[in-house]
């Protein structure tokens, strides 16, 4: 039953329609009890061997006007192209470094000792978190470039307002990938010039300055090729999208307890996900 709902995508109503003689409330109760039994077991994750990279992202919820964040973590072997998800953690309040400290503290010690890097969005306190543990910090390219885009009818498109904004997007994209040398130096100088002048909205100007300030962390994957760092958190975000779809179709995310229960079971059914760090256009 769990596999058909959490992996095959059936809803309880669809499965119930094929079970004559059973009332729907009783069927839902049986399913919840099966979920509880499954989640109460020892976590089934097998930590990959060798040096590891920690991938992390948060999934936001709101209950009765109060923010909650489901913290997702996965471990990728430096020489591998897949990530193994750990059990999620749900904490009340906005996403931040203090709560990420709690999440990191829950990682099994035998895995913690082998983590050499972390890939995250550019959130306040992440530099300190990485430094405290002696980890290389790789900031997500996708989130950075997304700040230079906007939404229109569900699709991303480059912000309008003149060719300068398009130039900034192109320059930053190149600066994320170019090796050290004169071409990169010229691009960075141009970005510094634009950050001091009229480069569109204040938000875009701030994004350029933040990028220049954290440049080494966006380019960590180039400085540490032996770590096999992905330069996005896309694999973790893919899990987040799957969870959102599951909550939508099952209508199971009505309260914090339900979110954590279903998310834990869902992730345990899908422990591994491909992690390639695809390029961003």
What are these language model-derived features?
Residues 69-70, 150-162:
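Short, surface-exposed amphipathic charged segments that create phosphate/polyanion-binding patches used
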Residues 110-116, 120-132, 163-281:
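Acidic/histidine-rich catalytic cores and adjacent linkers
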Residues 20-117, 124, 128, 136, ...:
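RNase H-like nuclease fold core
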Residues 1-11:
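Short, amphipathic alpha-helical "recognition" segments used to contact nucleic acids or chromatin
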Residues 133-156:
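Inter-helix linker motif
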Residues 1-2, 24, 263:
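Short, leucine-enriched amphipathic alpha-helices that occur as contiguous helical runs
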């Amino acid at each position: 039953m769990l596999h058909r709902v959490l992996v095959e995508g059936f809803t309880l109503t669809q499965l119930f329609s094929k079970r004559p003689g059973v009332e729907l409330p009783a069927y839902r109760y049986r399913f919840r009890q099966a979920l509880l039994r499954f989640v109460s077991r020892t976590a089934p994750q097998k930590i990959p061997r060798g040096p590891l990279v920690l991938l992390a992202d948060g999934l936001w919820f709101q209950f009765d006007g109060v923010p909650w964040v489901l913290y997702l973590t996965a471990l990728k072997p430096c020489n591998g192209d897949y990530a193994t998800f750990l059990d999620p953690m749900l904490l009340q309040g906005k996403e931040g470094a203090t709560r990420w400290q709690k999440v990191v503290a829950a990682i099994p010690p035998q895995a913690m000792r082998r983590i050499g890097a972390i890939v995250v969005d550019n959130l306040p306190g992440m530099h300190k978190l990485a430094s405290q543990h002696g980890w290389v910090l790789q900031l997500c390219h996708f989130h950075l470039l997304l700040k230079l885009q906007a939404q229109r009818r569900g699709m991303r498109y480059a912000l309008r307002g003149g060719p300068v904004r398009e130039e900034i997007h192109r320059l930053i994209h190149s600066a994320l990938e170019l090796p050290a040398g004169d071409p990169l130096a010229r691009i960075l100088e141009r970005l510094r010039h634009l950050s001091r002048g009229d480069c569109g909205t204040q938000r875009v100007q701030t994004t350029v300055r933040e990028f220049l300030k954290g440049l080494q962390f966006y380019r960590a994957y180039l400085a540490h090729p032996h770590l096999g760092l992905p330069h996005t958190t896309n694999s973790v975000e893919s899990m987040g999208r799957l969870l959102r779809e599951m909550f939508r179709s099952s209508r199971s995310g009505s309260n914090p307890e339900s979110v954590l229960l279903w998310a834990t079971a869902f992730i345990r059914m899908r422990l591994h996900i491909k992690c390639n760090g695809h390029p961003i256009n």
